[in-house]
Amino acid sequence: MALQPVPRMRRTLQNTQHTYSLGRRIYDVKTYPVQSPQGATILIYGHENGATVVWRGGRRLKPPKPQTNEKRNGTKPEDAVMIIDSDDETGPTFVDKPEFEDSPSVADGSVAEIIQTLDLALGTAVNHIAVLPMPPCAAEDASWNGANILKTKIVFAVTCATNDVYVITLPLTPPSHEAKARPELRKSLLAGNAGKGVWGETLTLLTGPSRSCNGVAISLVKHRSSSRSRSSERSAAQAAPITRVVVAAHSREASGTLRLWDVPLEAKPGTINRVEPFQTEYLPSPLTSISFNPVNLTQLLTVASPHAVRIYDYATASLPSDDTSEGPFPSQGSWLISLYPPFARGPAMSTSRKPIVAAEWIARGRAILTLLADGQWGIWDLDGASPTAAGGGSNLFSKTSAGLRGTAITAFSVTGHLEGTSPLRNPTTQKASSSSSGEFVPMTPHTRRDAIATAFGGSPEKLAAVRGGITVAQLPSTLTSGAGDESAVLFLGGADPIVCVIPVLSKFWDSQLRRAAGGGVNLWSGAQPTRMIRLTDLSAGLLGERCTGAVAITKAVRANASTNGILKEDDNSGSQGLPIEVLLQGESRLVIVHENGDAPTSSLTSRLLGARKKQRDEFKSVNAIVAYPPLEKPSVSFNLNLTQRPEKPGTLFAPRSRHSKSLFEQSIDTIPSTDAGDEETIPATSAPSSQQGFMFATDLELAADLPDDEADAEGRDVEQELLDIMEIDRELEQLEQARERGRKRVFFEEG
């Protein structure tokens, strides 16, 4: 089941959420860094029957052409040729030539459409997906490290529930409608399965694992002159190198296993090659996640929670005399460094470390951003990547930094906690009185807070069940002030997920360092790139499902079509709101979250106090479920005073006119009599000024006897009237809060 082209939209005060319901379970989702030739963003997600590739945005495919039948009744063409098929001959190969419209499908302020989807059926569930750690770019600029195949092919790796690991290549251009409607695909249910080459795809099977892999990573092999080759044929082959990738996968075999494969991208469509691993590492404990360095392609970041974060280099031999391998890499790599997280808090001295949820490379592979299970995040500066580092002298192992604190903890350059994670890091307080009495305790806000702290206290056993992740997206140079900037998405999953976004990592890192040094930087009222922003009201798009993943989608570009129709990046796209969109992974839904254009981006203090109210000028009625009431209209004025006051300009409530019509559209000056047989009207007498405030009481009994006017009742908007009354209450409450803030309370003790 593919994504529906039009998602279900939900708006909140902070963001807009577009929900795609798939109807089947989703195991993993990734954003491919290269755009398609027509400017679409490519998404890949795994499900119980394989993987699905989605092209989102860019220029639309042209509608399929109607099939014309050139055969005429009663005539016989002179040039008719009879073709006798034989079993040895095969039919002509279908060549797909998709055609696209000239204008892009994304207009300013609209939702990017789903241009095309393609299901790659593998007959088993795809649990994990890995893409190349390259910066986002257009198709014509995708020659990363000299790999020209990336200009025309999608290259990614998947792990399956049947212990198989595949490297898949696929054309970067989406298939046309004619290609998906070919008659040969209707002959069998298995005709369109992956591996047969009907979509131009190639599969390479990586053998070796005997259990399902828990993670996978992929990177390019950097071409270099090697002295390890022992034959002239191998040296001649290196003159015209073939693009190769290295795939790493870890599993729970034995106590933990890490395997690496060297895969050449030379398979032909319709064939499945098999590759054996060139390195196998047996570990003391299973790994949680792995990722390759985007610059130093041979370095692999491994997370062994809760012990440490370690860096493995498969190209550096563990022993200098290791020359038994005939390939370009040694038979055994080396472990370069181990980074240790802090210890968990508890009522007594704890010897358990905080579980490591995730860790990712940042600053072009020179630093590591990590997230712990109690909501703490930290940055390890390995190579002087700090924005305030002078000449690279303030890295983790410089003279000014010992690297290890107490020989057991690796010091963070900067650290903090995610918003909303205080119940995870506060240890439970054992109260002897409450534990021994056993009396019933009513649920109050204070006891509810204690219950949350008890359920999610900072004990290592309870923190081990916390799941989350980190996604780092490199930003194009046109979206930020400098080249090489990055955005990060940190999340802790669950029924009420915590998802935070760092718009620009370098500016956020710099502001944190200045704050730690007492530089006077106000993180609450600073510019948006210097703060960590938490996405709120995510349950509106997930519709009750648990959040199992979050990835970043770089905002590529908006509608500047060049001469060849390829979308180019807009310099102003990064100046409004976040430079990325967040893709949330539910159990059976995908939710794309982006910041509203009218969302307040000023100081957080003014937003919390309600001192600034944004007007929704471009609000239009949509056929969607919204998470807030419609646009507010001017409230109706009411006179709540008992005594009549002269009208004063600038007052909050204007006095009510006495000659206005009543609720039943009749004049108040003449009130019908309630006596039977008396059809004359009784003139309304003026009451004394002291009783004018209670004149409505005489109208209530008379109004109750009158029949209801159904036409007027249908025209009334009762909901709007209730909202007007609520608006009055809010205004009075804000006035009361403003008066309370300016009042100081002084207590005197009796001597």
Curated annotation (Swiss-Prot):
Biased segments, Basic and acidic residues type: 68-77
Gene Ontology terms describing biological process: mRNA transport; protein transport
Cellular-component GO terms for this entry: nuclear pore
Biased composition (Polar residues): 423-438, 683-692
Keyword field: Coiled coil, mRNA transport, Nuclear pore complex, Nucleus, Protein transport, Repeat, Translocation, Transport, WD repeat
InterPro entries in UniProt: WD40/YVTN_repeat-like_dom_sf, WD40_repeat_dom_sf
Intracellular or extracellular location(s): Nucleus, Nuclear pore complex
Disordered, as annotated region: 57-77, 419-443, 671-692
Stretches of the chain forming a coiled coil according to its record: 716-750
Disulfide bonds: none
Intervals holding WD repeats: 21-65, 162-209, 237-271, 282-322, 351-390, 455-492, 494-534
Superkingdom of the organism of origin: Eukaryota
Subunit structure: The nuclear pore complex (NPC) constitutes the exclusive means of nucleocytoplasmic transport. NPCs allow the passive diffusion of ions and small molecules and the active, nuclear transport receptor-mediated bidirectional transport of macromolecules such as proteins, RNAs, ribonucleoparticles (RNPs), and ribosomal subunits across the nuclear envelope.
Protein name (Swiss-Prot/TrEMBL): Nucleoporin NUP37
Native source organism of the sequence: Chaetomium thermophilum (strain DSM 1495 / CBS 144.50 / IMI 039719) (Thermochaetoides thermophila)
Upper lineage: Eukaryota, Fungi, Dikarya, Ascomycota, Pezizomycotina
Gene this chain is encoded by: NUP37
